[in-house]
Amino acid sequence: LIDPFGGRDDLAAHLVRAVGEPERRFEEDALRILRLYRFAARFGFAIDPATGAAARALGPHLDCVSAERIQEELLKLLAAPRPGSYLEPAVLAVVLPELEPEEQPERFAELCRTIDRIEPTAENVPARLAALLWPLGEAGARKALRKLKCSNALTDEVTALEREAGGGAGSFLLGHESGHSIARPIACGNRVPPQ
């Protein structure tokens, strides 16, 4: 096996690293920025510091990527075991600027913890997306989902969860410490979980 870029060593170290110059890789296709976080989340790997720095610096290049491609990577990221740890504020600020992840870091950190509390199954990706968009409320979530070109079915499911949870910026600021209690019923299929 010929391994000119040290991939086997990175696998052994549980590290995701761009091949060659990360800036160049991300300039070739900015969607690789989201893929970096998706693969790291999927396998629970760390991100090489230089690769992570390049991803954050070149995050604005995601504006040139189609909404459909961004949506696909975001949904795959949300299907990972603990995606909250890999939702990079500088990147998400480009993909979903209305969340203001860099302006409100405490709120964003609580959102990430809430997302991680929802069981990681394909069926729960809409619940995780609803948790991510919760500060926007139902109307804001619908607008964000349309911008990402999500299907009508996914948009309806996520906004129904938003409506049931009573999402919105004001309610989040008043009760952000209760995010885990909201995630528990969502993780149980919106049934009242056993006490």
Give the positions of each predicted feature:
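Active-site flanking loop/helix segments enriched in acidic
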Residues: V16-R24, Q71-K76, L96-A122
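Short, amphipathic alpha-helical segments that act as regulatory/interfacial helices
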Residues: L34-A41, L75-L78, V91
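Double-stranded RNA-binding/processing signature
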Residues: G59-D63
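C-terminal subdomains that position terminal phosphate/3'-OH groups for nucleotidyl transfer/ligation
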Residues: P101-Q195
